Amino acid sequence: MQGQMHAVWRKTRNRPISGGGFHGILTLHIPAFPRILMDILKPPRKGANVMLKSIYLQQVYSDLTARDPEQKEFHQAVREVLESLNLMIDSHPEYREAALLERFVEPERVVAFRVPWMDDTGRIRVNRGYRVQFNSAIGPYKGGLRFHPSVNLSIIKFLGFEQTFKNSLTTLPMGGGKGGSDFDPKGKSDGEIMRFCQSFMSELYRHIGPDTDVPAGDIGVGGREIGFLFGQYKKIRNEWTGVLTGKGISYGGSLARTEATGFGLCYFAAAQLKDNGKSFEGKKVVISGSGNVAIYANQKATELGGKVIAMSDSNGYIVDENGIDYKVMKEIKEVKRARIKTYLDYVPSAKYVEGCKGIWTVPCDIAMPCATQNELDGESAKALIGHGCIGVFEGANMPCTPEAITVIKSAGLLFSPAKASNAGGVATSGLEMSQNSERLSWTFEEVDAKLKGIMEGIYAACAAAAEKYGMKGDIQAGANIAGFLKVADAMLWQGIC
């Protein structure tokens, strides 16, 4: 049927349309022509993913890649979601009629702007800033700001798209957004970073607000940067409001926010391990990265009985078979802002290896990629499997390549996607928004207990969605389906907007 329809389309596509019909093999009245058949007559462009079984999904993806062919990271994120929707999309014809997926993969708003600032030598420098407000169907846009030389529109769009699902899974009323700049804070003085942040906020303030868009931190944006950004917003608007999360405790931040993503990752992993008759107890854990997510994943994994034996930064990785002391890592990264090699000054028996990719060759039971996107490829996944790894739990945003995910799942390892297991940070940001709105401050224990409950709830929702649509145990598919359905329902209720 599909091939016949495409043949018809090829024979008629260059003929003129008049009188409301196609001239040639078919003469049909267009207003009465069902949209679903129009989609079938329109052949997928080259590049449509063969794993997308639905013609509708193929068309959505091929149109997307044709529109922005250079945005590879964004394409990867969208394709991964669409593949998970194969088995459920045909039971929802209302999505096609409302062009819901076409709207879902297109941001509501993209803001790009220049960011001029002065360095310590008096030289004027210019960077590019972004804010992608992806979807506000279930709440104000919510998502972090990333300052890193690799930042471009494709990366910010992929992060905003992923954020929409992640926020949906928390069950809190937050839409999806993301922003950032190609500014590199590494090697910059506090004064330079302050001037950059002030310039960045001098444009961003026009587009955000506590009921519109609430940014937070991400790679390159920690407590220092959030403080500078918040101060500039407050000065420009002459108001104190919860417009940013990840703030310092002294000016409206939430206890446990710093620890939230790493702790949440381990709470999710513990729930998935438990559901499969396993636990952290006695397991060797490898965690890539050494930022907030990695450091606090180390702490919680250790508290749950695991032993973290390897961590990394962009220069290399350390191996400590006795277990990496997370307190030492906090001292190195949060106080001294030094490279991970400095760990050897504290623990001479540890080993340091140049280059960060080799960390996945370290034998372990549990792997937690917490550094950056596409850091764990197919070759690395095979190395983990060869050493008896039982599970890969994503802590960074999209850290595993599609090939790696295929290898991991085909080998029967447990796998959790970042949009689910990485949601602890934004969940606690939502709790910070609630505290700011009510002018309250909860204890660390209260926030941590709420976080644990949210992460266990996310796992349960993902597992249930996967089972409902015939993919029991596939937490990646379950996360995509559960996150999508809530936002899709809200979009249908709100009409074409």
Predicted segments with their positions:
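Adenosine-phosphate binding glycine-rich loop
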Residues: 52-77, 272, 385-497
